[in-house]
Amino acid sequence: MSMQKKGYYLIVLGMIFFSTVVSAQTKKKYPKSEWYISWGYNTEWYTRSNVHINQPELGNDYTFNRIKGHDKKGWDNRLFRKAISIPQYNYRLGYLFNPQKGWGVEINFDHTKFIFEDGQDASLTGKRNGKAIDTTVRFSKDDGFYYYLNNGANFLLFNLVKRYELISTKDGNLKLDFLGKAGIGPVIPHVENSFFGGANTPHFQLGGWNVGLEATVKATFFKYAFLEYANKLDYARYSNLKIYKGTAKHAFGTYEMIMSIGVNLPVGKRTAL
């Protein structure tokens, strides 16, 4: 065998040996499965939206067009002097059924708040008191108008979760992951409103459905505690919302930012895979 061939084989054997050693050194240990739970707070921006009002007894069937809405954070003013459930909050309860490949499922709840901007000039078209209308009204509480999903627009999603491991220290005490989430579920709004001075009785109800996509960066410390920052897109469609002597329909898109803290709860002994 020539020296050239011997050198070639030695290089190949060396590469195989090196890759085997590196593989052995970088094998990660995963639990059989893993639960996690988190709590945090959010802020939102909403698309302009239409609200359709139907009050047959009053001869009303009209729409507020391209209404502006905003959130009500609550956490930006004396957060630690109020109940933790008053500001716009979030919680997540998740289960990674395959930690090695990063697959899991999650219950995902966002206590968001949607409020029609007070004082805006709102386009109004349709039928009121049995007569056709195409006008503009000043949407303000002083003029008998308000529309609050203020104790919650309340998005509930059942998500499929995929985790991608980005960075980890050798001892696993610092870990950075990316999580992609997608889901669908009901909306459970608290409905409070008044149109032309006719106010409803504020109440919670099952009010429609929503779909969402979420991108999350998760930093885990000492294997258990974690901090998350998430960006989320959601589309919510509300129907049969109870108003004074009638119902309302409403749909809008949401861009949401979320900051949360949480804890991982591994199940089963960690094994190298």
Regions found by a protein language model. Name each.
Residues 1-31:
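Bacterial Sec-dependent N-terminal signal peptides
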Residues 31-35, 85-89, 150-156, 176, ...:
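Residues that define the transmembrane beta-barrel architecture of outer-membrane proteins
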Residues 56-143, 221-226, 232-238:
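Glycine- and aromatic-enriched membrane insertion/assembly motifs of diderm outer-membrane
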Residues 25-33, 98-103, 165-176, 221-227, ...:
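Short loop/turn motifs that connect adjacent beta-strands in outer-membrane beta-barrel proteins
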Residues 92-193, 262-266:
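Gram-negative (and chloroplast) outer-membrane scaffold detector with strong preference
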Residues 24-97, 189, 256-273:
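Short glycine/proline- and aromatic-enriched beta-strand/turn motifs that initiate or cap beta-hairpins
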Residues 76-79, 142-148, 195-204, 241-251:
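Extracellular loop and loop/strand-boundary signature of outer-membrane beta-barrel proteins
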Residues 49-56, 118-124, 189-199, 240-246:
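Outer-membrane beta-barrel translocator domains and adjoining extracellular loop/strand segments
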